[in-house]
Amino acid sequence: MEKWWLNSMLSNEDLGRRCGLSASLGPIGNTSGSEEPIINDSEKNVNSWSGRGSYSCSNVDYLFNLGGVKDVWSLISGETFWVRDSNGDSYSIYFDIENKIFEIDTDSYFLGELESLFSSYLNLNNGSKSYNRYYDHYVYDTRHSWKSHINSCIDSYIRSETNMDSCIPNGSNNSSDNYIYSYICSDSERGSDRGSSNLKTSGVSDSDFGRHNDLDRNKRYRHLWVQCENCYGLNYKKFFSSKMNICEQCGYHLKMSSSDRIELLIDPGTWDPMDENMVSMDPIEFHSEEDPYRDRINSYQIETGLAEAVQTGIGKLNGIPIAIGVMDFKFMGGSMGSVVGEKITRLIEYATDRSLPVIMVCASGGARMQEGSLSLMQMAKISSALYNYQSNKKLFYVSILTSPTTGGVTASFGMLGDIIIAEPNAYIAFAGKRVIEQTLKKTVPEGSQVAEYLFNKGLFDPIVPRNLLKGVPSELFQFHGFFPRP
């Protein structure tokens, strides 16, 4: 069941216009006792949802939600409200934002039940008559305790670079419209919290808008927001890339696409990709009736815009020419098949011939099972090319481990860097936690496969935050004799 806090919105005329409430709440007028002007349109008739004609209702004093009354769940729907005007007349209002339905009923029995229940609720909670001038009508006004806070949150939320003014006044029922209603109208807690919920007060915090109990609702607005997998905070997607996919709430490093990493590390205008059109041809004819390998490859190509799980090429890092390979976890979990292995091997051989430093950014679940032993052979092939590059040619290879780096990538080129860099909180392992526990029948300690723990065990060199990830390799390259070129 959904509950909506509308009083705060009705007491802000400018916000009401931007959220499109003027059209749907036309019959509701203003009262002289209101602290702020309520949305006030011309008086008009509204069709009754019970089919008994129409009602003209203006000058309504107050609109509130009965979400805090435990026994009302069986009487009212998710968007039903009780209104009492200055004449003492009562109405029940059905309000459906998504379908733009606004209906009014004056069923006396229904309202009598609500009055009785609400009266009991106030007596149970020791409501004070001196606190609220609407007490005689069994209306518990929470305005003074939370209105200022909610209004502040709403105004800053809408005005903060979301450009809502350009898309809402035309009355379109687009997804950003629904988003603002769902989040700004503060769809309150549901599910197991129903039995213990009370009317919201000034204790509401900004972080409540990103609680984990809103996960289902957030799926509808993925094109607008990115939810942190660590703190469940919301990050505005439009600016998320410019913040290097770092959560604004807790600083957690979320996954980045290979294209975003190339943009982060490589100087603008210097990127020259290699072997872009190399794709897998299903070498062992892996067959699955539910999800054929070729169909799966095609779907990931469409979804990511990539041909395979790694991008390789030449570019400049702070003016220093380098060869770089960047794995993309969004493409089949960054799994390493024959094409991934071949592209990385060719990159290393190219860098060997031209004496270029190499960076490999790892993000992989390991070898690709759909290619069988051919995928395992890539571990040896890449390691052999690196041996010639490092031991024979004495060139410099930097491995950057991001979350997650596991399986065959960890067991091969991921751990062969002259300098091994890890990102904060990166998940780095050979076998995953579930595999270890199911195989060895032992419990894996929590956090034992995280970068900070492994750093203390000496598994790699520095842990470098993402905002410094371009500067640190640049200094390392110069220390090893690689300098910027014009």
UniProtKB/Swiss-Prot annotation:
Keywords: ATP-binding, Chloroplast, Fatty acid biosynthesis, Fatty acid metabolism, Lipid biosynthesis, Lipid metabolism, Metal-binding, Nucleotide-binding, Plastid, Transferase, Zinc, Zinc-finger. It holds the Pfam family Carboxyl_trans. Its EC number is 2.1.3.15. A zinc finger (C4-type) spans 228-250. GO terms for molecular function: acetyl-CoA carboxylase activity; ATP binding; carboxyl- or carbamoyltransferase activity; zinc ion binding. Zn(2+) binds at C228, C231, C247, C250. Binds 1 zinc ion per subunit. Residues 224-486 form the CoA carboxyltransferase N-terminal domain. It catalyses: N(6)-carboxybiotinyl-L-lysyl-[protein] + acetyl-CoA = N(6)-biotinyl-L-lysyl-[protein] + malonyl-CoA. GO terms for biological process: fatty acid biosynthetic process; malonyl-CoA biosynthetic process. Its cofactor is Zn(2+). Coiled coil: none annotated. It is found in: Plastid, Chloroplast stroma. Gene3D superfamilies: 2-enoyl-CoA Hydratase, Chain A, domain 1. Pathway: Lipid metabolism; malonyl-CoA biosynthesis; malonyl-CoA from acetyl-CoA: step 1/1. GO terms for cellular component: acetyl-CoA carboxylase complex; chloroplast stroma. InterPro entries: AcCoA_carboxyl_beta, Acetyl_CoA_COase_Trfase_b_su, ClpP/crotonase-like_dom_sf, COA_CT_N. The keyword Cell membrane does not apply. Belongs to the AccD/PCCB family. Component of the acetyl coenzyme A carboxylase (ACC) complex. Biotin carboxylase (BC) catalyzes the carboxylation of biotin on its carrier protein (BCCP) and then the CO(2) group is transferred by the transcarboxylase to acetyl-CoA to form malonyl-CoA. HAMAP family: AcetylCoA_CT_beta. Acetyl-CoA carboxylase is a heterohexamer composed of biotin carboxyl carrier protein, biotin carboxylase and 2 subunits each of ACCase subunit alpha and ACCase plastid-coded subunit beta (accD). This is Acetyl-coenzyme A carboxylase carboxyl transferase subunit beta, chloroplastic. It comes from Nymphaea alba.
